[in-house]
From Swiss-Prot:
Belongs to the glycosyl hydrolase 18 family. Chitinase class V subfamily. It comes from Candida albicans (strain SC5314 / ATCC MYA-2876). Keywords: Carbohydrate metabolism, Chitin degradation, Chitin-binding, Glycoprotein, Glycosidase, Hydrolase, Polysaccharide degradation, Secreted, Signal. This is Chitinase 1. SUPFAM superfamilies: (Trans)glycosidases. It catalyses: Random endo-hydrolysis of N-acetyl-beta-D-glucosaminide (1->4)-beta-linkages in chitin and chitodextrins. Induction: Transcription is greater during growth of the yeast form as compared to the mycelial form and up-regulated by micafungin treatment. Disruption phenotype: Leads to increased hyphal growth on solid media. Residues 1-17 form the signal peptide. CDD domains: GH18_hevamine_XipI_class_III (cd02877).
C-alpha cells in the first residue's frame, strides 16, 4: 500500500502541468549535443530517447550520439548510459521510445509481443543481460511512438511490462505519442486497453494543430476518469516538422485555455535539439509557468490588427493581415503634394478650402480575408494617384504607425493586405473602386486653371 502511494506521488510530481517533455536522439536541430548537456541546461523534466526503431530484432538509432556496438551488432552506447544516470540524479525522468516515423518494427501476434517485454526489461529495465546498450543504467519507462498503423501486440506488450514494473524498486512509466486525430490509427487500441501515464500528442503535421482545427476537447474527453496526463505536442522549430509550428503567443493563448483541465500535463517537444536553438524551449517553459511576456517576432503579425491611414483630412481604419515586411512600431513616411497644390492654388486666388470642397475622403477600406495558404511571392507594388514631384517642393509628410502586435502565423509565412479604396468627387456622381491602389483625395481636385501653369513651368525650366 505504501509503495503504491509512493508511486502515485512520483507520478503526480512528474506530471506537473508546468512540465516539459522533450524527445532527444534524432538531431532534428542539426547540432545535437549529448544527453547530459541537455539535462544540465534545459528546463525539460522528461527526456525521451528516440529511437529503438527495430524490434523484435533490436535496432537503436541516436543519430550522431552512438557509434559503438557489441559483437552481435547491437548498439553499445556507454556515454548515453552514463548520461542517463547523471540526468536521473538531477531529477529528470528518462524514457526509451519505441518506433518512430521510419524503422523496421512490429509484431505478428500478442504472444510475440509478450515475449519481447522480457527483452526490454532485461536490456533496458531492472532485469539482467550480457548485452545492455546503456550498461547498468536503467531507464524510467517506455514510450510508444508507433506510426505504421499496425496495432498488433502493443496492448499485450504494455500489460506485460506493467507486470515487470511491479517487481522493481523504483517508479516506471508508460507513455504513447499519438497523432492528434482521435482515435490514433497506430496506438488507439493501446490507449483504450492499457492505463498509460502520459500521452505526448503530436499537434502538428495534421489538420488538428494549434492554428487549425485544434481538438483538445476530444483528447480531454478520452482522459476523463483516467490518471493519464496529456501533453501538448509541438515541433521545436519550423524545420523539425512539415507543418504546425506556431509562435509563442499562440502557445500562450492555447495553454491559457486548457491549463484548467485536470488532464493537462505540460508541453512535449520534437525535438530538444531544434527547440534549444533560439531559446524557444525556455520561452515555452516561461509560458507554462506563467512568467515572461509574449514574444513579438519582427517579421510576423497577427490578423485583425487595426491599420489606420489618413486621406484628405479624414481617417479610415480597417482590420487586415499585415505584410510580414513591416516592422512592429515603425513609422513609414510618404511625400504628398498638399503644399504644392496649395501654393499653385494661391497663385490663382483660390484658397485651400476651395480645393478641399471637391474632395470626398475615403469611404471604406476593407481587408482581404485570411488566405487559405500564405503567399510566398513578392509583395505587389501599389501605385499612387498623386505626383511626388521628385522632392523638388517642400511637401508635407504623413505617416502611418503600426502598433506592436504578436504573431499567430508562422514566421516563415508571408501574408499581404489588399486595400479597397473608394474615391468620390462632386464632379463625378458615380463611385468607383480601385484595388491595390492607395489614392490621395487631393488627386481628384485638379482645377482647370492649373493647366495654364504647366507651360509657364516648362518655360522657366528651359
Amino acid at each position: 500500500m505504501i509503495l503504491n502511494l509512493i508511486i502515485l506521488l512520483a507520478i503526480s510530481i512528474v506530471a506537473s502541468a508546468s512540465n516539459i517533455a522533450a524527445y532527444w536522439g534524432q538531431n532534428a536541430g542539426g547540432d545535437q549535443q549529448t544527453l547530459g548537456d541537455y539535462c544540465s541546461s534545459s528546463p525539460a523534466s522528461i527526456i525521451i530517447l528516440s529511437f529503438l526503431d527495430g524490434f523484435p530484432n533490436l535496432s537503436l538509432n541516436f543519430a550522431n550520439q552512438c557509434s559503438g556496438t557489441f559483437s552481435s551488432g547491437l548498439a553499445h552506447c556507454s556515454q548515453i548510459g552514463s548520461d542517463i544516470k547523471s540526468c536521473q540524479q538531477q531529477g529528470k525522468t528518462i524514457l526509451l521510445s519505441l518506433g518512430g516515423a521510419t524503422g523496421n518494427y512490429g509484431f505478428s501476434s500478442d504472444s510475440e509481443a509478450v515475449q519481447f517485454a522480457g527483452t526490454l526489461w532485461n536490456k533496458f529495465g531492472g532485469g539482467k543481460d550480457s548485452e545492455r546498450p546503456f550498461d547498468d543504467a536503467i531507464v524510467d519507462g517506455f514510450d510508444f511512438d508507433i506510426e505504421n498503423k499496425d496495432q498488433t501486440g502493443y496492448a499485450a506488450l504494455a500489460t506485460q511490462l506493467r507486470k515487470y514494473f511491479s517487481t522493481g524498486t523504483k517508479s516506471y512509466y508508460l507513455s504513447a505519442a499519438p497523432q492528434c486525430p482521435y482515435p490514433d490509427e497506430s496506438v488507439g487500441d493501446l490507449m483504450s486497453q492499457v492505463d498509460l501515464d502520459f500521452a505526448f500528442i503530436q499537434f502538428y503535421n495534421n489538420y488538428c494543430s494549434l492554428n487549425q482545427q485544434f481538438n483538445w476537447n476530444s483528447w480531454s474527453n478520452y482522459a476523463r476518469g483516467k490518471s493519464i496526463k496529456l501533453y501538448l505536442g509541438l515541433p521545436g522549430s519550423s524545420s523539425s516538422a512539415g507543418s504546425g509550428f506556431v509562435g509563442l503567443s499562440t502557445v500562450q493563448r492555447v495553454v491559457a485555455s486548457i491549463k484548467g483541465d485536470s488532464s493537462f500535463g505540460g508541453i512535449s517537444i520534437w525535438d530538444i535539439s531544434s527547440a534549444e536553438n533560439g531559446g524557444y524551449l525556455n520561452q515555452l517553459h516561461q509560458a507554462l509557468s506563467g512568467s515572461g511576456s509574449p514574444a513579438a517576432p519582427s517579421n510576423s503579425y497577427q490578423p485583425n490588427t487595426p491599420l489606420t491611414r489618413t486621406y484628405g483630412g479624414s481617417t479610415a481604419t480597417a482590420s487586415a493581415y499585415i505584410s510580414v515586411g513591416f516592422t512592429a512600431g515603425a513609422t513609414h513616411g510618404s511625400t504628398t503634394t498638399n503644399d504644392l497644390l496649395a501654393w499653385i492654388d494661391s497663385l490663382f486666388g483660390s484658397s485651400q478650402s476651395s480645393v478641399q470642397q471637391y474632395a470626398t475622403p475615403v469611404q471604406s477600406v476593407t481587408a482581404t480575408p485570411q488566405p487559405v495558404a500564405a503567399t510566398t511571392t513578392s509583395a505587389p507594388k501599389p501605385t499612387a494617384s498623386a505626383f511626388n514631384w521628385f522632392g523638388w517642393f517642400d511637401g508635407t509628410t504623413t505617416s502611418t504607425t503600426l502598433q506592436t502586435v504578436y504573431s499567430t502565423v508562422p514566421a516563415d509565412q508571408t501574408v499581404y493586405v489588399t486595400l479597397t479604396t473608394t474615391v468620390g468627387s462632386q464632379m463625378l456622381q458615380s463611385l468607383f473602386d480601385k484595388r491595390d491602389v492607395i489614392a490621395e483625395a487631393k488627386s481628384t481636385n485638379l482645377q482647370i486653371c492649373w493647366l495654364l501653369f504647366i507651360p509657364l513651368l516648362a518655360l522657366i525650366c528651359s
